[in-house]
C-alpha cells in the first residue's frame, strides 16, 4: 500500500451545529487526496478488481467520466500501478483535464455529437 492510500477516507469529522442535545457532524471529504468523496469508491473498485484477478499491475483501465470520479480513478490507478484512459466531453473544464493528466491519465475528449460510452469502441 502506498502512503497516500492511508489518507483515502481518513478525513476529519467536525461538529457543524448542535440543536438541543443533538449534534450535527460533517465529514471533510475534500481532504481526500484527489479532493472528493469519489476517492473511496475509486480505490475500492481497483483494489477489489485486483484481488479478484480481473486486473493486474500495468493494465490499462478505461472509464467514461465527466468529473470527480475520473480524477479519483486517475489518482487511484496511478498509485496502484495502472495506466488510465478517461473519456470526457469536450466541454469538461481545463482544470479537470489538467488534474487527470497530472495523475498520469490519458484524457480523450469527445464532441457532443459523439456518445461517451459508444466512443469506448474506438479505443
Question: Whereabouts are the PLM-identified features?
Answer:
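PLP-dependent amino-acid enzyme catalytic core
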Residues: 1-121
